[in-house]
């Protein structure tokens, strides 16, 4: 099994601390064979909203140029993939699809951080009330689009909750795993979250209960470092996460396919024409 990671952020998202090239060098030094750089995507909002946790639209071109430059510069030492981490914002998904085609994005990972759009400031980590259902519904709807290589931190809803799982959340975890199985969308074992669990002394995400549920389905799992600083690419963390994930009866994969966004667009057009 190759040591790979497709969940990498840089200082461009305004809440991570590693520069692009620093992250690449850290990955090489720590034995990674493939590094996917997948910073939080920009969005073309209908409003004048400015997000605090992602690059702005006018910052994307520099991000793209940098990743492609590093991909070529370090091609003899590591394979670099050009990705983004994106939510499922229904009213902006057509724009995102066209954006991925135009910019030849290799893949998206699905980070379900906000409900509907972050313009509304409804954060889904530790969601309460009606947004518990909203979290799981949007996970499922997003996974069904075929636009995402995998679902990142599927247990994000447990953030800042102490890891308490209600019957409603347990049912939602089953829905995620059933959709993962039916639509062949892998699930991420999030290594940044594992670090948080270790510091706190209890589980939020990743959570044992979730992966016990996942083992009841025919799902695929992938490690995601969710690197926000160069220390997050430590090989020891990767190995520890692999050891933990290997305890569950799930298939562990080390690669994700490039997503054919042109094909997805063509299939949508066929549906519209019917």
Model-predicted regions and their roles:
Residues 1-86, 90, 94-95, 100, ...:
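An N-terminally biased module of ancient metal coordination in phosphate/nucleic-acid-related enzymes
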Residues 1-10, 20, 25, 158-274:
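Charged catalytic cores and adjacent phosphate/nucleic-acid-binding surfaces used
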Residues 2-5, 34-36, 79-83, 106-109, ...:
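Structural preference for beta-strand elements that scaffold enzyme active sites
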Residues 3, 28-29, 66-77, 96-106, ...:
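Acidic (Asp/Glu)-rich catalytic clusters
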Residues 17, 42-45, 106-199, 204:
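Divalent metal-binding pocket/active-site signature
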Residues 46, 93, 117, 128, ...:
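Serine/threonine-rich low-complexity intrinsically disordered regions
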Residues 62-65, 133, 137, 209:
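Short, contiguous clusters of charged residues that form electrostatic/catalytic patches at enzyme active sites
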Residues 84, 111-112, 256:
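Residues at the C-termini of beta-strands that transition into short coil/loop
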């Amino acid at each position: 099994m190759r040591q790979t990671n497709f969940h990498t952020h840089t200082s461009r998202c305004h809440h991570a601390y590693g520069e692009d090239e620093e992250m690449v060098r850290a990955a090489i030094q720590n034995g990674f064979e493939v590094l996917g750089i997948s910073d939080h995507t920009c969005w073309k909002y209908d409003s004048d909203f400015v997000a605090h946790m992602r690059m702005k639209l006018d910052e994307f071109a520099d991000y793209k140029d940098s990743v492609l430059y590093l991909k070529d510069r370090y091609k003899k030492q590591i394979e670099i993939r050009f990705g983004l981490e994106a939510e499922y914002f229904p009213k902006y998904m057509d724009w995102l699809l066209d954006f991925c085609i135009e910019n030849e994005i290799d893949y998206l990972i699905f980070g379900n951080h906000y409900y509907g759009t972050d313009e509304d400031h409804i954060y889904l980590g530790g969601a309460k009330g009606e947004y518990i259902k909203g979290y799981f519904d949007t996970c499922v709807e997003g996974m069904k689009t075929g636009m995402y290589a995998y679902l990142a931190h599927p247990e994000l809803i447990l953030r800042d909750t102490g890891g308490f799982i209600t019957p409603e959340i347990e049912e939602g975890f089953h829905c995620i795993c059933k959709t993962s199985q039916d639509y062949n969308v892998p699930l991420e074992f999030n290594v940044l979250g594992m670090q948080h669990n270790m510091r706190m002394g209890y589980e939020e995400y990743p959570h044992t209960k979730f992966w016990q549920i996942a083992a009841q389905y025919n799902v695929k799992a992938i490690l995601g470092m969710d690197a926000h600083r160069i220390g997050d690419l430590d090989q020891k963390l990767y190995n520890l996460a692999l050891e933990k994930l290997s305890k569950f009866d799930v298939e562990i994969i080390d690669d994700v396919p490039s997503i054919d966004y042109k094909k997805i667009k063509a299939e949508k057009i066929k549906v519209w024409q019917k």
